[in-house]
Amino acid sequence: NTSASVDHDCLIEDFAHISPNCSLSGSVRVGKFSHLGTGTSVHPGIHIGNNVKTAVGSKVFKNILDDTVQKN
């Protein structure tokens, strides 16, 4: 996607959506059907579960469980 950055050893599962200007550091996993809002930054080694939604500009420092909506 436009200006998205996906670093080494990341796993993006089926039907996950990475919006423009997202940044995934190394060894990040994004689960099925998850949606990372525009400008989301994910720190190294984070696991984002299935069917997760993050708000625009989110900073993800901790793992996110399945079926979660993360607001800023």
List the predicted regions and their residue ranges.
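Glycine-rich hexapeptide-repeat left-handed beta-helix
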Residues: 2, 11-15, 19-72
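Short alpha-helical catalytic segment bearing the HExxH-like zincin motif
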Residues: 5
